[in-house]
Amino acid sequence: MVKFSTSITCVLFFSVFGFNVLAGKSYSNNAFAFKFQQDTSKKVKSVDTIGEMVRALMKYNKLKDTIHLNSVKNVPNLSLQQMVKGNLAGVYVQETTGEPGTEQSLIVRGPSGLMFNKRDFATLQPVIYLNGVPLTQDHTFAYDVQQYDYTRIGPGNNLLSQVNIDDIQSISVVKDPVELAKLGPNAANGAIYITTKQAKGGIRSISLNSYFGYVTPPGVYTTNASYEDDFRKTFYNRYANAENRANYPGFLSDKTNSDYFGPSNWNDLYYQTAPAYNANLGISGGTERANFRFFGGLTKDAGNADDTGFNKYNLGVSVNMAPFTWLTVSSIVSTARLDRDRNRSFRDRFAEARYIPDLRVPISPNASNYSAYLSEVDKSADLNRTTALNGNLTIAAKLSRLKLSSAFIFDYSESVRDHFTPSTLMAGSNFVSTYFGYNQRILVNNAASYDFDLNTDNHKLTVQIGQQFQTDTYKYNYTRGYNGPNDFIKIIRVLGNVYNNDGTLNPDYLNAYPDFYVFRFLDKLESNLFSVYANASYKYKNIFDFDAVVRRDGTSNGQPDSRWVTTPAFNATWHLGSQILNSNKTIQALDLSAGWGRTVNIFSDDRFAAGPQFRAEGGWPSEPTVPGYASIVTANRPYTSGYVGYGLPLPYADRTNVTIAAEMLNGRLSLALSAYNRNNKQQVINTPVAQELGYISSYRTGLEINNKGLELLANAALIKAKSGLTWTTGLNLAYNRNEVTALPDGLSELVYQGNKIQVGKSVGSYWLHANAGIYETDSQIPVNPSTGQRATFNGIPFQVGDPKWVDVNNDYRIDESDKIVTGDRLPKLTGGWNNTFSYKGFDLNFNVFFALGQKAINQFDANRYDFVNRESANDISSVREISSWQAYSNAKTYPIYNPFSSVVPYRQDQDLFLEDASYLKLRSVTAGYSFTKLFTKAGIKRAYLYATAMNLFTVTGFSGVDPELVNFNGIYDGANITIPRTFVLGFKLDL
């Protein structure tokens, strides 16, 4: 992180509330000075807004942890996660699939909580402020009615895809404890500011940007049944008995079957070269007292497989007015529509329909058979649409030294999915599902500040008080139905007659037609947050800054005795350069900043506020949505999901941050080193309880997780030749160490959802058996001297061909007590390296990013080798996609165990399949040329042509297709679409 000074913090905060602020820089000490405007008609040429304030600070981006937009604005990134990947220190992005428009993960300075499933990761995400609007995300309560969490019900669109890089003025990550404390509970996991280009006065300005290109398919080595038959022969020749051979899969037995042993040419129907393009227009203009900006854009992106695609439509308007010299009014509204063509995979379709067919025979790799399947898929329907609307209205008044502001802020997103699967793909019974849901957030912010007159220019003091009210609403209606009338009616038909023929009310009105089995689910969650705060900012000359804030938050999601929490924070900055470097010609500035702050993390679920409760839980793990018995809805205690009692205070996070930043060589080199420590305390976790209580588990407080680390930012102008040749480079590095420091009731370890959480280990650790080889002879199998019996695995004696798993406690019984906690799902070191070369009108940019130290379980290989149990299980993990008919050049080889053994030798919970998933990628290369000088007389301010290539190569030791395709939980299943290599040609034109 680079320095977050008190002055920057104040300006960003005041800007959010609409204050008009001027920024200036003292080059002698590298400090900032700000003052409020007094007369909008005389002091400035245009009305300032949030974006104008941040734009004023962009000149000093060496002192902020901000993306250098010049290096990413020519790269066709679709989502915010893709824009910040490798460009912000301490921000780790997981893009687990190349399918455009899907969910992606952002984690700032390490995980604050558990990370074993999609629900966990959703609670780790930072808040995103778009023009001061804290954006909502899809709520996790929808997972309560899902059997699988591959994709959340609904369209599954990435809501952070609504931004357009050509409309963005700045992207900054907030790490200053004081700034985060001011933002309150929304920023418990960190915050990222996005500011779009705002309205400004002056001559009308028009900006036109566009690109066109293609995503390309990967190189594929296809296989047929002969390849799989040869693979299995090794195991059958060594271990199979007569019964095993008699049960050999039929699709591998008949070598004359051309469907499986014939041409494997499915790839041309699955992989694709698809167009990607973008076009947008921005117009701004107006007078000094009233001005506007309009932005509209269309983006089409595509995946390189399975006919996936994504369309985005953007529209934004901002208006500024100054009706009086002491009053300003600013408003900005942005809207976007997101349409996604999702994949046609078996797994996702089966998970949605909760229907698992006979999986013993996979789909044929032959193009004719696969084409016939796709023709049936074309009879399906799948609409995935999200509409987002957000904005704010800010009124600010300046009355001498008193400043008043009031802001109305809103965010609303609406999601729809209509899905239909014909009966030909569902064993004679078609399937329909519909989803409607929305997320709504409304805020009212009021603030007043006063600049005290201390009768001296050496001391400056500003005090601010404020009040905020926030209300959130999340709702969804989800319906799925089976056995519709026919495949032409692709909606859930209901009986529409209010009255019977005899005039009586029809009790079945709006019920589904007979034999149409319909299941309906709905949920709604509302929460309110009320906050008051006080902030004081003090400045002594250009030597010392001090900022402090105290905030009081009350939430409806808290328990009665802990709904209100007080959180303080402070930060101090010493401008050492003004004291010790006045005559130094090498170092022009040296600043030391230190801060501490506390942020409350309110519960996202209202179940904890209710205390002991009843729930509709009549199901079981494989069918969690059964609401009752014999058509009667039942309410029961949460015996399976976990008892909720009292004594659950709100979690909170304590942050400490120390940063030293320097500017050297007349601005050609800037360095910043930050050390941070964050303790997340009083977190609630579901823990086991005694069986005689009737409950499986109970929610308890006491989980504590610590993240500490170092971050380095370096920016340098390595070459600034008189000939016009320049080379600028930027490097960001972030090291993070995660550790569980406490568990409820003083526990040292806890088995949780098939994982073990252990104090002193990372929360992202794996719980695995340690593999030490293979038992090749009977003499190698250990014998218990006290019983004379062979060592066992969960009570099953070891045989020749079984794995050697380490007996940690030396009791000759391999079980869960012998598993070890090892590895980490998240990297230790992340970073990015950006370089730009320019010569006259030409420029060349390339971007490299990397993540080192993370581990992944190769479930894809585990399932491939465990073919006996996978095929006999016939569950969701047994699904074989069409893309499984290919071989990989970097595939690993494993010991030849007995796949028929009852110990399941190729189980995935062993370190045999734990791999180093570190990687380094050349993410983008851009070459461009400015034609501006050729069109100056034509009134063109800028004309720029560029070409960009993305995802060019990866350096990794991981045996899978791509280490980025590892799922959020650290499992690589090989089911995700590859991230495509993309080539585009574009232009930027300013008039």
Where are the model-predicted features located?
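Short aromatic-centered micro-motifs
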Residues: 128, 538, 808, 837
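Short, small/polar-rich motifs associated with maturation and membrane association
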Residues: 1-302, 306-316, 328-330, 388, ...
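Extracytoplasmic gating/loop element in the C-terminal half of outer-membrane beta-barrel translocons
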Residues: 851-945, 949
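Glycine-rich, aromatic-lined ligand/substrate-binding cores of catalytic
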Residues: 824-857
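Extracellular/periplasmic, surface-exposed regions of secreted and cell-surface proteins
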Residues: 318-337, 367-421, 431-768, 905, ...
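Conserved small-residue
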Residues: 209-257, 475-492, 700, 721-823
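C-terminal extracellular loops and terminal segments
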Residues: 81, 697-706, 747-766, 817-834, ...
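Outer-membrane beta-barrel proteins
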Residues: 113, 140-142, 147-148, 155-199, ...
